[in-house]
Structures are given as C-alpha cells and as structure tokens.
C-alpha cells in the first residue's frame, strides 16, 4: 500500500478514490428520488453515477498497480469491484430505458457496498497484501471477477424486481407478452399487431407501464447474472481441482453459491416454462438478493471456510 504524508497526515490514494466514489453516489441518490417525483432531471444522477464508476475504475487500476495482482484478493477490494460492476450494470440498464426509477432503485446498492467498504471495514482489511500461494493463479481473474460481475447483475436485477412492488403497490398486472418476450428490452415506442384485425397494416403503438419495464429489465439483468454465475461456478470447480485435488468440497461459500444458483434457476424456470410474470417471479428474485448477501457478506465476515476473507476471527 502506498501512503502519502502531508503534515503528519497520511492517506491511501486507493481508499481516497473509494471515498470520492461514495460521495458522488451519495449526491446521485437524492437526485434520483427527486427525478422520480418529477422535481429533477434523471440525467444528472446518471452523470454522477458515471463519474463514480470512473473513480472506481481508477481505484481498481491503481490497486492493481500497487499490489501486482488483480484487485479482488480481500473483502475491501471485492466490495469495490462489486460496486464498480453495479454502477456499470446500472448505466447499461439506464441506456436501455431512460427512467429515473432505475437509478432510484439501483443507486442504493452501490452506495451501501462502497460505504461498507470505506467506512465499516477496519484499515487492515483495506490494505493490500501478498497473495497466498493458492491464489497465485490465472484462475483468480477468471473465477472471482466473473463471480463478482454475476453478483452485480443479480443484485441489480433483484432490486429492480423489488421496484415492481414499489411502483404498482397492490395492483395486479399481466405482462402483455410471453416470458421470453417480456425479457426483451421494450421501449414505449414499440409496435404491436392488433390480433383483432387480420389486416397487417393495423399496427398500433403501445405504452408499457413502469412495472412492465422494470420487470423486463430485471429479467434481462438476472439472466445475464445467472449465466455469469454458472461460468463462475464451473471455473471455480476447475480451479479447486487444480489447487486442492477436489472439484467440490462443500465449503460454506460453495454451498451458499449453489443455493444462490438454484434460487435464480427457479426464477428463470418459472418465467420460461411456467409463464410466471410480474410479482410472482419477483418474490424469488428478492429471495435471491438475501441469499447473495449471506453468501458474500455473511460467510466472509464470519471468516468461515477457504473462501472467506475474514474479519471477526482474523482481525
């Protein structure tokens, strides 16, 4: 870790960049809520999130240069990488649907993640350290980075599913297409064929509700996250076999990662084969959100198993 001294005050530039990212997300949060209420322009919040993502990118690059290895070797680095992934996913989703609702429901996830890393973790966990021999492998980037990106996509998708309840309250709605179709990015200017008229010229515009848009974006985000999680689990099994001679050891992190995979597999199964849409699959997505929290934060902080980054027992 590189520290700069100024009048007997030392600071780590990596941690400082994390603070800067937190501040920009903190400014973006109320603007997002005001934009939902119609009192502000959501593009301002989007700009602040983009600036935060740039700070996080710079932070990860600087830590990589300092440590000599990809910056996902401890809890602090992985939280910063997770925040980077969440902000990037949010920007992509907002590009697909320019609505303040996306920013209002997604920004808190990134803010809590970088806030926890910057203000809750002790200094010894914020510092870089040499990799243990088992982690000195090219699989580190392949496995851990893919897993963290999957967590980012799944967390954002789950929060968007929760937004379905916030937007529609107790109302019931049905997505006006199939589970495959509802997963597509839909814009309000899309066209649909009036089935009551056999004339192919009878094409009319249809306005999709906020709940339908949220459901659509959530479905896509969770699908991407599930695919990444699958790749991450497979690469982790291959790496484990090379490092420890076992494909699967039922380590607490492995077990909870499998539970996470099963929950989101059930989500996709109910949408694709059972035709569930709207609030029913959203319940599974929200359950998956809490499973990720236990898998990632809970196991790590308890310092249990080979995958934990430790805190209470190691600090």
Curated annotation (Swiss-Prot):
Keyword Transmembrane helix: yes
Top-rank taxon: Bacteria
Entry GO CC: plasma membrane-derived thylakoid membrane
Compartments reported by the entry: Cellular thylakoid membrane
Main location: membrane
One GO MF term attached to the UniProt entry: heme binding
Record keywords, A-Z: Cytochrome c-type biogenesis, Membrane, Thylakoid, Transmembrane, Transmembrane helix
Subunit structure: May interact with ccs1.
Protein name: Cytochrome c biogenesis protein CcsA
Organism: Prochlorococcus marinus (strain NATL2A)
Higher taxonomy: Bacteria, Bacillati, Cyanobacteriota, Cyanophyceae, Synechococcales
């Amino acid at each position: 870790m590189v520290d700069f001294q100024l009048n007997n005050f030392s600071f780590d530039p990596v941690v400082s960049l994390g603070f800067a990212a937190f501040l920009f997300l903190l400014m973006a949060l109320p603007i997002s809520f005001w934009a939902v209420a119609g009192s502000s322009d959501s593009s301002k919040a989007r700009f602040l999130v983009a600036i935060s993502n740039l700070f996080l990118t710079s932070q990860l690059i600087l830590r990589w240069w300092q440590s000599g290895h990809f910056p996902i070797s401890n809890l602090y680095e992985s939280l910063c990488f997770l925040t980077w992934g969440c902000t990037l996913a949010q920007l992509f989703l907002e590009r697909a649907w320019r609505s303040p609702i996306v920013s209002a429901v997604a920004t808190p996830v990134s803010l809590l993640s970088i806030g926890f890393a910057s203000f809750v973790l002790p200094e010894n966990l914020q510092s870089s350290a040499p990799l243990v021999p088992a982690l000195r492998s090219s699989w580190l980037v392949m496995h851990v980075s893919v897993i963290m990106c999957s967590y980012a996509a799944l967390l954002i998708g789950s929060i968007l599913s929760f937004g379905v309840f916030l937007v529609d309250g107790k109302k019931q709605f049905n997505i006006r297409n199939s589970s495959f179709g509802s997963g597509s990015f839909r814009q309000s200017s899309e066209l649909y064929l009036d089935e009551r008229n056999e004339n192919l010229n009878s094409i009319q515009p249809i306005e999709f509700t906020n709940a339908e848009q949220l459901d659509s974006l959530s479905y896509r985000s969770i699908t991407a996250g599930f695919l990444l999680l699958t790749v991450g689990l497979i690469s982790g099994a291959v790496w484990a076999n090379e490092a420890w001679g076992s494909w699967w050891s039922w380590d607490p992190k492995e077990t909870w990662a499998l539970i996470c995979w099963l929950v989101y597999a059930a989500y996709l199964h109910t949408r694709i084969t059972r035709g569930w849409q709207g609030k029913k699959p959203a319940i599974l997505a929200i359950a998956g959100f809490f499973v990720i929290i236990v898998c990632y934060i809970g196991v790590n902080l308890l310092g249990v198993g080979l995958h934990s980054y430790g805190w209470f027992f190691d600090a």
